[in-house]
Amino acid sequence: MLAFEHHGVVPYEEAWARQRELHALRVADEIPDTCLLLEHPPVYTAGKRTEDFERPTDGTPVIAVDRGGRITWHGPGQLVGYPIVKLPMPIDAVGHVRRIEQALIAVCADLGVTAVRVPGRSGVWITSPGAPDRKIAAIGVRISRCTTMHGFALNCNPDLSWFRRIVPCGLPDAEVTSLSVELGRNVTVAEVRPLVVARLTEFLLPARPTDRVPTPQSAAN
């Protein structure tokens, strides 16, 4: 079972505190696996591998966080998800990231956007021959006591100019895009949210030893 908490625009520090609360409850088995879905006011956050040259050059504040990955931006028009999920042993961090990617690739497909994984790069991408790869969703996670924190940010209709002040995710040869840019119309967070709920419910939770083994028909996704 995957539960959801739906919020509007929440300051980053407030959402981070809520993540920690839910994480402690999930570790103690007091709640089911739970995903926060929300937006943030404009903010830069830097993962543990962020280099100085990747930070904004104009002195814009950056919040250091305990997730993997590098620097990114969050803000209105971007649907942010924080899945708090207890993983089975042995812990498969890469598998967790891949399941998030698969869910978001499916969301993009639901809207008519062909998105893919790019080898060696986390997140969800749009690729075109002869053009730079364009990131449409960023992913950065942390696992503590077998339970995940942080998650993903899917660009619906944000102001992409914020990304020009940084080296997003430490990738100077890549660009950032959104569902609205790719489709040529305004794609809102409200439109995308139910699709994300459906696809996370379908893909996110890992198989556990007690789960029913699916038939070949139900496993063909």
UniProtKB/Swiss-Prot annotation:
<feature type="binding site">
    <location>
        <begin position="151"/>
        <end position="153"/>
    </location>
    <ligand>
        <name>substrate</name>
    </ligand>
</feature>
<feature type="site" description="Lowers pKa of active site Cys">
    <location>
        <position position="135"/>
    </location>
</feature>
<feature type="binding site">
    <location>
        <begin position="138"/>
        <end position="140"/>
    </location>
    <ligand>
        <name>substrate</name>
    </ligand>
</feature>
<keyword id="KW-0808">Transferase</keyword>
<feature type="active site" description="Acyl-thioester intermediate">
    <location>
        <position position="169"/>
    </location>
</feature>
<dbReference type="InterPro" id="IPR004143">
    <property type="entry name" value="BPL_LPL_catalytic"/>
</dbReference>
<dbReference type="GO" id="GO:0036211">
    <property type="term" value="P:protein modification process"/>
</dbReference>
<dbReference type="InterPro" id="IPR020605">
    <property type="entry name" value="Octanoyltransferase_CS"/>
</dbReference>
<protein>
    <recommendedName>
        <fullName>Octanoyltransferase</fullName>
        <ecNumber>2.3.1.181</ecNumber>
    </recommendedName>
</protein>
<keyword id="KW-0012">Acyltransferase</keyword>
<dbReference type="InterPro" id="IPR000544">
    <property type="entry name" value="Octanoyltransferase"/>
</dbReference>
<comment type="pathway">
    <text>Protein modification; protein lipoylation via endogenous pathway; protein N(6)-(lipoyl)lysine from octanoyl-[acyl-carrier-protein]: step 1/2.</text>
</comment>
<feature type="binding site">
    <location>
        <begin position="67"/>
        <end position="74"/>
    </location>
    <ligand>
        <name>substrate</name>
    </ligand>
</feature>
<comment type="function">
    <text>Catalyzes the transfer of endogenously produced octanoic acid from octanoyl-acyl-carrier-protein onto the lipoyl domains of lipoate-dependent enzymes. Lipoyl-ACP can also act as a substrate although octanoyl-ACP is likely to be the physiological substrate.</text>
</comment>
<dbReference type="GO" id="GO:0033819">
    <property type="term" value="F:lipoyl(octanoyl) transferase activity"/>
</dbReference>
<dbReference type="Pfam" id="PF21948">
    <property type="entry name" value="LplA-B_cat"/>
</dbReference>
<comment type="similarity">
    <text>Belongs to the LipB family.</text>
</comment>
<dbReference type="InterPro" id="IPR045864">
    <property type="entry name" value="aa-tRNA-synth_II/BPL/LPL"/>
</dbReference>
<feature type="domain" description="BPL/LPL catalytic">
    <location>
        <begin position="29"/>
        <end position="208"/>
    </location>
</feature>
<keyword id="KW-0963">Cytoplasm</keyword>
<dbReference type="GO" id="GO:0005737">
    <property type="term" value="C:cytoplasm"/>
</dbReference>
